[in-house]
Amino acid sequence: MLECQSMMEKLSPFVDVASLEIESLRRIKRPKRFSEEESEETENTTNSSNAVFGFPNLPEEPNRDMDQSVLCRICVRLPDGRRIQRSFLKSESVQLLWSFCYSQIGDESSERKRRFKLIQGFPGDYKNLYFGSNTTFEQSGLANSLVSVTWL
């Protein structure tokens, strides 16, 4: 019996530390579930904001009277079947294309929350476009092309 008692005395400092750690963990706020975060997010955001997905602000469309060597025209096919066009400067970031597509997606809140991807199609193949690429329209080869928006 003495062995058990001495063993308990040796382990007691560790048990005390463990109980303190458990108490401190109980005091920490529990992370919110996804559905709770989603409901708060929908209350705090508006449908016209690009900030929901972190897209950059879309500047005004360049004037068509500008030199055609610095402009490119992009045609976008949306998931609802509409086709829209917009001019960009060839030196602008491709990330603006995501802002433009997001601004044209339907006004229903369910569509505004959905994630989408952009695909550039050409005969016999297609290319997925990635938001993280910091290239210009000229560097990416998107100048004067057709891009499709599809839901993820």
From Swiss-Prot:
Residues 32-61 are annotated as: Disordered. InterPro entries: Ubiquitin-like_domsf (IPR029071), UBX_dom (IPR001012), UBX_domain-protein (IPR050730). It holds the Pfam family UBX. The keyword Oxidoreductase does not apply. Residues 67-150 form the UBX domain. Gene3D superfamilies: Phosphatidylinositol 3-kinase Catalytic Subunit, Chain A, domain 1. The keyword Transport does not apply. Keywords: Ubl conjugation pathway. PANTHER family: FAS-ASSOCIATED PROTEIN, PLANT UBX DOMAIN-CONTAINING PROTEIN 16-RELATED. This is Plant UBX domain-containing protein 12. The gene is PUX12.
